[in-house]
Design a protein with these regions (language model features):
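Short helix-coil-helix linker/hinge
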Residues: 12-18
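A short acidic, leucine-rich amphipathic alpha-helix
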Residues: 22, 35-39, 54
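Short, Lys/Arg-enriched N-terminal segment that forms or immediately precedes the first helix
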Residues: 1-11
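Conserved segment of winged-helix/HTH DNA-binding domains
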Residues: 68-100
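Residues within helix-turn-helix
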Residues: 33-34, 45
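Short capping segments at the starts of secondary-structure elements
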Residues: 17, 28-32
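Beta-hairpin "wing" of winged helix-turn-helix
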Residues: 56-71
Length: 100
């Protein structure tokens, strides 16, 4: 994946207020789907849609934890370190480099 495509994917994932709230919610600790949905004040289904987009962009990573005592699996989500610097000069350089 080119740098310009990677940047576009991250910016797209960050382009929704609910996804920004999810990022703020899991900033300090990983959480499972219900915790995130409850903290953000949205349904599980909507949280899952937004988390999927964040995970696809590499901003969020998930892992499955199986609680043996309860015999159920929970998917935990955690924020991945990221830092985005954008300027017209950087964009021009990356577009020229990628040939797009």
């Amino acid at each position: 994946m080119s740098q310009i495509t990677n940047l576009a994917n991250k910016l797209d994932a960050l382009g929704h207020p609910l996804r920004l709230r999810i990022i703020a919610t899991i900033y300090q600790k990983e959480m499972y789907l219900n915790e995130i949905a409850n903290n953000v004040g949205i349904s599980r289904a909507l949280a899952k849609i937004h988390l999927k987009k964040l995970e696809k962009s590499g901003i969020v990573k998930s892992r499955i934890f199986t609680a043996e005592a309860e015999a159920k699996a929970l998917r935990y989500y955690e924020l991945q370190p990221f830092d985005i610097h954008v300027s017209p000069q950087i964009l021009k350089k990356e577009v020229e480099k990628s040939g797009q």
